[in-house]
Amino acid sequence: GLKEPVQPQVSCRYRCNETFSRMASGCSCDDKCTERQACCSDYEDTCVLPTQSWSCSKLRCGEKRIANVLCSCSEDCLEKKDCCTDYKTICKGETSWLKDKCASSGATQCPAGFEQSPLILFSMDGFRAGYLENWDSLMPNINKLKTCGTHAKYMRAVYPTKTFVNHYTIATGLYPESHGIIDNNIYDVNLNLNFSLSSSTARNPAWWGGQPIWHTATYQGLKAATYFWPGSEVKINGSYPTIFKNYDKSIPFEARVTEVLKWLDLPKAKRPDFFTLYIEEPDTTGHKYGPVSGEIIKALQMADRTLGMLMEGLKQRNLHNCVNLILLADHGMEEISCDRLEYMANYFDNVDFFMYEGPAPRIRSKNVPKDFYTFDSEGIVKNLTCRKPKQYFKAYLSKDLPKRLHYANNIRIDKVNLMVDQQWMAVRDKKFTRCKGGTHGYDNEFKSMQAIFLAHGPGFNEKNEVTSFENIEVYNLMCDLLKLKPAPNDGTHGSLNHLLKNPFYTPSPAKEQSSPLSCPFGPVPSPDVSGCKCSSITELEKVNQRLNLNNQAKTESEAHNLPYGRPQVLQNHSKYCLLHQAKYISAYSQDILMPLWSSYTIYRSTSTSVPPSASDCLRLDVRIPAAQSQTCSNYQPDLTITPGFLYPPNFNSSNFEQYDALITSNIVPMFKGFTRLWNYFHTTLIPKYARERDGLNVISGPIFDYNYDGHFDSYDTIKQHVSNTKIPIPTHYFVVLTSCENQINTPLNCLGPLKVLSFILPHRPDNSESCADTSPENLWVEERIQIHTARVRDVELLTGLNFYSGLKQPLPETLQLKTFLPIFVNPVN
């Protein structure tokens, strides 16, 4: 018979990289065809593009296996586990993850071999929460995750809001002062070494404290794989994650996702349970172009496509409703300008020190280690305080920084710190040029520093928005998802239980360590050597008798003044007794000769008139033995210390009632300068807040934190700091204001959630922090207390008290209240 004529080849389909043959007719598809100008017209699309593309196309479906492709679209790719992530969608007609409805809240949908849901922690560097608010419609994958899963309005970074600092806090649940990575550039006098991101010293385990989540997992029998994370390539505590990658920013995001998916394909015996994934965007673009730019939108879309690729890859493995995924950022991004720089050269004739410049500056001696301890930090702060009518930074000694920052208790934190205004930077001199585009590092209360937090998977509640929280809480959350026991950390375990479908950990209430003693009503001591006098009291016996409450009156006082339970004392061997008055209750400490706390409730209508007769009137509390009482002679006129009141005597409804507060058990030692702030706060601001919130419960008291570690000092430590008076001087005073979130209800008849405002006010001799030594209080007090806002949890750690012990709600709800931080910062327009 006749042979069919050989048809000349016209396409490269199924022919890529074939061996060149001179006998073949038509066009070629071998790798040298371009040199001979003999390629088929579809050679580029069929044979070259697949080596550069991470996705399938109709043309690629069913392709013959090609060497060097990034991913495959051949018929056997599922079996070979090298398909592009969109293979099933493009080549098999399945719907994509993005087009699917949100998963139903059925049981965990895991394929065979996955008894426990893997956890992926995915960080998009510098993804500020505002980006998602403004441009969510341009990021369909992230928006779907937000819609279907759990997300927070924002997640608060720790200070300074830098990359390494926050990534390592997320991994350990520790504040920077606890884990040691206190900035991207650090000097440690004990090691006599400098740390920077680019130097090899960053790999020295001596810098890295705490236990990162990848170790917690491996120590408890799980496997952990990290595709980049600060600290993951350091031999911390003698070991690495099970699998880790050395940082290389040139690796494409798609290659990172593909590798994580390959790890999920490993046989069960080798497969990790915990994964990290990190991409540099939108941070890199934010630095270059600033947070409001067309370029940032492109970077966000690139980040969104990276998440989409991960989710499609998970769906292809039927893991999209099996894996728990946390998508978060380390910090936000702020716009900067070379017109907004504060130069140290404008404050010093000779800038003779070393300065870490930028949005979170620190200053130390340049001659280290020699002058490290003798450097005049106080002098520098003084020289930078109240120098100009308008300064765009405030200088602090680290021990005086707002306690909410937890940024003092580490030798690596230099003593001089500048808190810089939004969009400004503080630098040495005009040589500084890195002032265009965007940066981060500022106060973590600034809106521009807020980060995203989204979570999705069978462990999380669906379609759930939660209030903001701090990133120190994420470590405990990850431990719960992996069913691990966390290492000690700064988070409050259980405070994020409302994110989880079936919380793994149930917090238990704190146990009181010291119960109150009794302080019985007794006769007036004779002779009275207290040095106290009060000429306006004519009927002393009658006035004192008011302090002798019967049991029914005590119960009524407790219902009124302690609506959420009595603060419990978690310090050991604390000797104190409860003192009941009609309008306030206090816990008087025989160790420090002042109340540990005082609690009272004021209403919208509480009168705050100051009775003229009582301005200089004080007497001994007859319930306290003279030896355990403060005396008026402790306060000599030449001392800078004066008696201040915890419960204000002017919150009274009758002339007689004021005398209940004019007693030595209600006084605390205060610097005269501080009483200006304290008195204005109590006579003006607290009544104002009570009007706005339909009443307030107020608990206030002293704090002793001489070693500035953020935890209460022992009595031995306190005693070392008592000089020229037997009364110890507090380092701070706290005020916790609680009201009903539903403002139709007073604090006493509140059935729903509570609202809290708490403050930790540094007790300092002057008001230079506000440059207010001559200004009237209405111009500066409220702004100052707002800088020193804090969580109730911070107050608890600094006092050894436990608040809200009488609340009937589940404990995790109370922990949410205790970890809430009120924020007053106004965004820059």
UniProtKB/Swiss-Prot annotation:
Q: Name one GO biological process term.
A: nucleoside triphosphate catabolic process
Where along the sequence does the record place the motif called Cell attachment site? 36-38
Catalytic activity annotation:
ADP + H2O = AMP + phosphate + H(+)
**SMART domains under this entry?**
Endonuclease_NS, NUC, SO
The lineage's top-level taxon is Eukaryota
What SUPFAM superfamilies does its record include? Alkaline phosphatase-like, His-Me finger endonucleases, Somatomedin B domain
Its chief place of residence is secreted
Query: So where's the catalytic machinery, residue-wise?
Result: 163 (amp-threonine intermediate)
pH relationship of activity: Optimum pH is 8.0-8.5.
Q: Name one GO molecular function term.
A: toxin activity
The protein's PTM annotation reads: N-glycosylated. Glycosylation counts for an increased mass of ~9%.
Quaternary organization = Monomer.
Q: Which family does it belong to?
A: Belongs to the nucleotide pyrophosphatase/phosphodiesterase family.
Name the chain's protein. Venom phosphodiesterase CdcPDE
Q: Which organism is it from?
A: Crotalus durissus collilineatus (Brazilian rattlesnake)
Q: What is the lineage of its organism?
A: Eukaryota, Metazoa, Chordata, Craniata, Vertebrata
